[in-house]
């Protein structure tokens, strides 16, 4: 059964994730991710939590804006899944700055009452 409080917390987590990515606040972003977190890029490349945070910090991944977000959220007990669709301003892996129609499928788990991201699969919509 989905709790409206959980949905609000997960919506906030999505917004905070992008705020942290844009600000290059890898400490705040890292606190949202499990130690075994994996990001799967749209190319299929996989990044560990450490590698993902390092790529944000060193400028390999640059995020500038996130607009027009639409979220679908489902919660089952201590696990949740979000699909977020946003227009994201980014320059990644040495490419130019573009607006991406980015879709993130995000898996989360609740630990000690707090939600953590375990897996993100990126694509476009």
Description of each model-found segment:
Residues 2-31, 38-125:
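A beta-strand edge to alpha-helix "cap/lid" segment located at domain peripheries
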